[in-house]
Amino acid sequence: MSTSTLINKAQTNSCGDVGVVDLLKRKVYDDTVKTMQGLDRRAKYRLNQCLGPEQCRTVRGGYPEFQIEFTGASNTSHAMAAGLRGLELEYLYTLVPYGAVSYDIGGNFPAHMMKGRSYVHCCNPALDARDLARNENYRISIENYLSRFEDKSGDYCQWQRKKPKVSKPLPRYQKACFDRYNEDPEHVTCSETFEKCRISPPAERDDIYATSLHSLYDIPYQNLGPALARKRIKVLHAAFHFSEDLLLGASEGLLTQIGGTFQRNGDVLTFSFLDESSLIYTHSFRNVFEYVTRTFFVACNRYAYMKEFRSRRVDTVFCSFIRIDTYCLYRSVFKDCDEHVFAAMDDAWEFKKKRVMLEASRPIFNDVAQFNVYFPNAKDKVCLPIFAVKSVSGAPVTTRHILVEKDFYWTALNHILTYPDGKADFRGVMSFLESIRSRVVINGTTTASQWEVDKSQLKDIALSLLLIAKLEKLKISVIEKRIKIERQGLVSLLKEFLHGLLDEYTQTMAEWVVEKGWVKSVDQVLQVTIPDLVLNFRDHFRCEFRTSANVSEVNVSEHLVATNEYYAKVSDLVDRNPTLAFDFEKFQDYCEKLGVDIDTVTELIDAISTGRAGITLDHTDDKEEQLPRTLAGSSSYLEEEPSDDLVCLSDKAIVNRSTILGELKNNVVIFEGTLPKNSVFVSAPDDPSVTIELSELHARPVSDFLSMQKPVNIVYTGEVQICQMQNYLDYLSASLVACISNLKKYLQDQWLNPGEKFQKIGVWDNLNNKWIVVPQKKKYAWGLAADVDGNQKTVILNYDEHGMPILEKSYVRLVVSTDTYLFTVVSMLGYLRHLDQKKPTATITLVDGVPGCGKTQEILSRFDANSDLILVQGREACEMIRRRANDNVPGSATKENVRTFDSFVMNRKPGKFKTLWVDEGLMVHPGLINFCINISCVSSVYIFGDRKQIPFINRVMNFSIPDNLAKLYYDEIVSRDTTKRCPLDVTHFLNSVYEKRVMSYSNVQRSLECKMISGKAKINDYRSILAEGKLLTFTQEDKEYLLKAGFKDVNTVHEAQGETYRDVNLIRVTATPLTIVSAGSPHVTVALSRHTNRFVYYTVVPDVVMTTVQKTQCVSNFLLDMYAVAYTQKXQLQISPFYTHDIPFVETNKVGQISDLQYFYDSWLPGNSFVQNNHDQWSIISSDINLHSEAVRLDMNKRHIPRTKGEFLRPLLNTAVEPPRIPGLLENLLALIKRNFNAPDLAGQLDYDFLSRKVCDGFFGKLLPPDVEASELLRLPVDHMYSVQNFDDWLNKQEPGVVGQLANWDHIGMPAADQYRHMIKRTPKAKLDLSIQSEYPALQTIVYHSKHVNAVFGPIFSCLTERLLSVVDPLRFKFFTRTTPADLEFFFRDMVVGDMEILELDISKYDKSQNKFHFEVEMRIWEMLGIDKYIEKVWENGHRKTHLRDYTAGIKTVIEYQRKSGDVTTFIGNTIIIAACLCSILPMEKVFKAGFCGDDSIIYLPRNLLYPDIQSVSNNMWNFEAKLFKKLHGYFCGRYXLRNGRYLRLLPDPLKIITKLGCKAIKDWDHLEEFRISMFDMACEYKNCFGFDVLESAVKESFPKAEGCNVAFCAIYKFLSNKYLFRTLFSDV
């Protein structure tokens, strides 16, 4: 029953249940998708010959294993056969194991070299002149290929001689082949026949194969077996042509599919093509006949080769000759020689004497080769004899055979047998046959004949059928009757019976029938034999058996060993230089070109980096850089050797206050004192007397805390350790100030709905005794409260029996956060402020140990419970040490001698200690360690840590800790170089990280694995596996995602430092590049060294961890030597200045086809064009799906959507453009979850008010021209902002529908600014990467206000935007709004001169990443421009907590502080934020040019400027998942900024244009024309082809595999400029 019948039947039974029908249709679609996915995984083959559509279908049907691309780039004779020859070769080598020694008999060795098959030897004997020409063509093809890699300039190619210059290296996979051919061409190709080939296979190899592509005819069949055995060939895979007509006695056999023909003249068999008379190949028919009919080919007295048929494809027969060991035959097949002779004697009457003797000498394999197996054209046909006689009477009758359909034969014969004896003549039979093969007319309708019979053979068939019918009648008449023939001979009897059949030929025919043995007399009995109608081919093969042998098994151990040793040398080089960017292929080619090994080059790089080679890479004399470099230098107290390249101050040097202030040019505070040698330290408080005690915390005004705010850059002087202690106090102050400032902002916000949740805070309504915002935890230690007068004070909290806070009645509201859960910061700051800041007198020893070296075990073994103290950072580590210590000595570890740092400072207890032991001390601020040393009064301190693991991390973003003060001071350092935890492969990695030799006691050799997952949702598929190990993540965002997904016991890598686990599963579900996941990052070192047995890395994107794991998997099982880490510095090319002129115009040629566009797209984004996404939405709707969502209210009545199929034009260009989707509950919810609910949380602790104002000042200070300084000049007059003229100007720009909606507005009250509507764009954004192949893209969400809200705020922000654009420096900065692409090109026109650095900051989830800090920054900028306070407050209330309603999908939810994609400040607000972000990071006052557009940006900077890590600051301060690109060609607003000599052009991205040409949302032809016009308006610059070469280089900079660029650029202009040609890109469905 068909699928459509099932669907219709199910629809009838379900009374029109659409769901059941959709499920059945879904089943059909799923099966289709699985089939298409399987087909897409096939090997790809490009066939260049020009073939017709029917030929293309034939080739595809004959080779379904390949995904064939027909380019039609070559128009040659016998194109079908020529194109198939390469395809047949690739098919043969799919049967040969990769890397196995192989002989290609008569093979095309250039084809093997291009494919990188260095394990193939080709035998190319010159048996005739055509072979000589073919071999010469092989060598010419190699020269043509090598010329592609040579310089094409005329300087190297001259008439007199050619001086080739290689401009690029060969591909890596071909290098081994060309090396082999260069060293010894005889090993690649020889001029001997295969039987006499002198190239022997390696003695140790037994995986030896051979192939024969149309070359088997020239090897005598009796020599094939011995020749294969001499080379120890295991299997010979062969392909050859043959026609079954030749076996039937025909002199000609046609191969219609390839246009070939066989001609036979005796034993001479010639092959040629119908359309090519010059190509004629001559063979021996007997030799070819033996290859076709034989089954076994004897090699020696033991081995033979059995022919096994594989398939027949497009007139080509494929078979395999498999070596068999006759000694392995079962013993029951043995017979004596006499038995062989006797068994064959019975067949002597049918076969010749020679055949009998040959049968007796062969093995007793009675195998049968069926005729219709080898030749499928003979299936269901019979072999009919055709008789012919000469015109001269008495001449003999000749016979040949043809194939006719069996049904036709029996139908005709049975009908002829019904004729009476007197009426069975040739004319009647001929008339009948003509009638049954002709077309007939039945009821006015022409009906084709059931059988196809050649008209030219019809008369011969009639004659044969008449003769066979006569014989059948004769047999029937004499059956079971004895006939006496004494008086009449057999011939005369037949002559009488056949009288009238052939008239004068009756005598001759009767004699011929008797001679053939069809009619004979045996014992006076007439026997009539009808010839067999189906031919059978048998080849009996017999020999003697004397010994036996066992079948050898396949050995795979060598493959495993080779895998371990692969790339060992290259891995060693990269491990020693993890910070260098190596292109392995280019680096290897460079080393081989110089003739040096990789070890020598590595030593040279190391010597240059360390200075041992006497070469200095870095020279700078810029005075502006000297002070920052000095401040960034390391102290002699912290380094084992002094740094010679720093600016040094003499010991006890006098500080010149004015000089330092002049250098810094910022808010810098200097304290008198002395500077230690080789050190300058930064930071000190303004007023050391301002302190906050814990006892004074209650009812303390907020102003007391805010007065503790410190300048950003503060200089400390004095002893190193004292400066560290002062810096730690300022760090605590900054943390407390940031906390209070944020609580103040939350306290001033308006909260309407009780019981909601917001970020990590809680808001208590003291008047109504309930939580307005429910906190995550209970019983916070303190908070910030506001009284009835609006005064804000800190309060210490108490709670009732129900866990509710108890406050005085004078307070109306309270706010708490995760930072107020404990008194940690307040208590520590209050106590440490009163301590004397003196240099510790204890001896400090740093025990620097590698991961797993037993640092904690050493502490416990040396710890004296009566006199020592152990301090650790976290509570979990503290409990672990107490447990382990008490397991050894019960009661030794107590809460008095094993404590955390916070507990030791806050809960001070009397007593002194002798020795202080600190575990993982390098994760603690050095100032806190110095304080604890003084408090504990110890005489010796042992700090255990690892300088290569994660150090102390500053969590307060508006406070800086100089690198000098972040390093620990110590008197002595002791190393621990042997790990007890890490397996051997991890130890190998550690040797690339540490400068010392690392060894391991572990007996686990290999433990590292990595797995790529297609998306973060796929991590749920590994839930059962992940339950068996510790779960770690790099970021808190990934940790929160796993916890929301239901995973338990998840920690970050930072939290797990110092811990040990048996199995570790490290998970990364964030695709954005992370600073902590990079080469040399301590987070990577910690992540890879936490386990003892097994480590598995699950990641959605390849990164340095995955690369490290893969490299480690390739090394051998022993530890490698250790080397130092080397650094290098890249040099920049200098560009000479030149003059600018108008851009020349060169009209673009209108060339190129649709196939050129498709080829360009496929080379850029391979695989995207094969994505079948027409039914993806219905797959999502009809499948089970698990979603992790925030709080949301759903109307389940909206879950069903009508499946209406829109009528759209079908694009002929296949791109990854999604078809339009129908909005619905699931679709809209999925978009909401993947976009609005998937906002990153990367930022650290920020003081929103302080930092927003600082960023605002920097924004205007850097973007405004020098003549605009006073803030009063920025402010817009209020009268103009709220004027009627301003509103009219805004209203005139709106659509008529908007005006109609506003006409019904009553203008009573302010519309609700926090109420938004939610919808989705029906057409997803086109993907310009490969994610479409494995990910269902979510639709873009639109969150928009009503038109009433826009009418209030639209004119205001429009006026403010105009003011902002008018004050920004127009010569250096461009906000791409209210401008044209021509204006943008004019702005960047002078960027062709100068040595500059081009920076692009690409941010994912830009709108959704914006939080309270971004909103504060934007509002500060609007304040500077003059926005009204009331309007600002209303706008803030509408964005802090947004209520979304999706009426189409039935969704209601609330989101916090995200950029709304549909309000009046969406575009300009995004543009302001990206500009402010870059102004806070980069020295924008020094830029040449900068452009901003939404989330897009481009900056032209001078080279060698100092600026912080942009990606890190974007993550930690701005909460952006950012990627920084430094390229030769800029990219801005979807256009490439191309610098071509003296000119600069902005050309649209060709990939975006070609992708849009595959649009699946075109309704009709009129819509298509509108679409073309809009596309041509965008890409009209393509009419000028000047600069296309630069555009190609810019494209290949991002996508190196892009091919066919110039033709594609011309094709874009060709189709877009002609509406008739553009219509050919689409078809009407």
Swiss-Prot record:
Keywords: ATP-binding, Helicase, Host-virus interaction, Hydrolase, Inhibition of host innate immune response by virus, Nucleotide-binding, Nucleotidyltransferase, RNA suppression of termination, RNA-directed RNA polymerase, Suppressor of RNA silencing, Transferase, Viral immunoevasion, Viral RNA replication. Residues 1396-1509 form the RdRp catalytic domain. It catalyses: RNA(n) + a ribonucleoside 5'-triphosphate = RNA(n+1) + diphosphate; ATP + H2O = ADP + phosphate + H(+). Residues 69-292 form the Alphavirus-like MT domain. ATP binds at G849, V850, P851, G852, C853, G854, K855, T856. Residues 845-1099 are annotated as: Helicase. Residues 821-976 form the (+)RNA virus helicase ATP-binding domain. Residues 48-473 are annotated as: Methyltransferase. It holds the Pfam family RdRP_2. Its EC number is 2.1.1.-, 2.7.7.-, 2.7.7.48, 3.6.4.13. One of its GO terms (molecular function) is RNA-directed RNA polymerase activity. It comes from the Viruses. Heterodimer of a large and a small subunit. This protein is translated as a fusion protein by episodic readthrough of a termination codon. When readthrough of the terminator codon TGA occurs between the codons for Lys-1130 and Gln-1132, this results in the addition of the RdRp region to the replicase. Belongs to the ssRNA positive-strand viruses RNA-directed RNA polymerase family. This is Replicase large subunit. It comes from Sunn-hemp mosaic virus.
